[in-house]
Amino acid sequence: MVFDVDGTLVLSDRSLGHYDVLPGAREVLTELRSRAIPYLLLTNGSAYPPAEQAEKMRRLGLPVDDHQMLTPSSVAADLFVRRGLARVLVLGGEGVGHALRERGILTLRPGEPTSGKVDAVYVGWHPGCTMPDIEAAAMAIWGGARLYTASDVRFFATKGGRTIGYSYAIVGALRRLTGARVTVTGKPSLHAMRYAAERLRLAAADIAVVGDDPLVEVLMARRGRALAIGVTSGVTSASEWRRQPPPRRPERVLRALADILEFVRPPGSGVTTRGPGAPPRGRRRRARRAASARQ
């Protein structure tokens, strides 16, 4: 299983300094672990390195090992290594580039003296972004660097309600300036879905993706042929879920997170929605094919 974090398991304040655990989160993860059902947390937040974020979850009582915490930077580091991108200009805090450096990628910051070509610009959590930062990134893109971002999502759920995503705003400025195409490494990209599946050592069809955003977790699950499960504890209410078009509509919407335990099975037997109100398997496969054709 792949769980979203903000709005699904926890709610944070705007500064990410304090978290509240959402109902059922501790119990669900603890039960999954006791049943030997593998799970990961996949956040679009890039402020902290994965191990540091996992430690924050453990302090809240959530059973999350370091290797079970994935961020967009985890995906980006893997993607950059695969594509041979060795020099990356990072727009973001110290935690944004940590996973890249762990994979041997040279990370550069705006204003630092550089020699040699910049291969990519990577935008993450950057509340202190300045115009000189944007100019440095634009110059690198004009010089041939590819544009990547941790997240291209407008909002995420916090205790204060919907909060804008910094990287969305920064990338908007860079795209307007340069006309560059952007590659998203976090949700809802297929890069994120495939990386999570590789880490779980499962086919996407055997994975459930649980989240609160139709444009993020559900869209990623649909694109990747995973099972999409929606929750109402974040940015989307039950009535809003019902109004979603088919490509953004989950196969189940949970009244409570703990309801997910009704229809998960151990590794090797897949994930099923054949609990109360679940569609027959044939209908589920046909719905997936129809949704895929419309994308």
What is the meaning of each model-derived region?
Residues 46-49:
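Canonical radical SAM enzyme core domain
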Residues 1-37, 51-67, 77-294:
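Asp-based, Mg2+/Mn2+-dependent phosphohydrolase catalytic module
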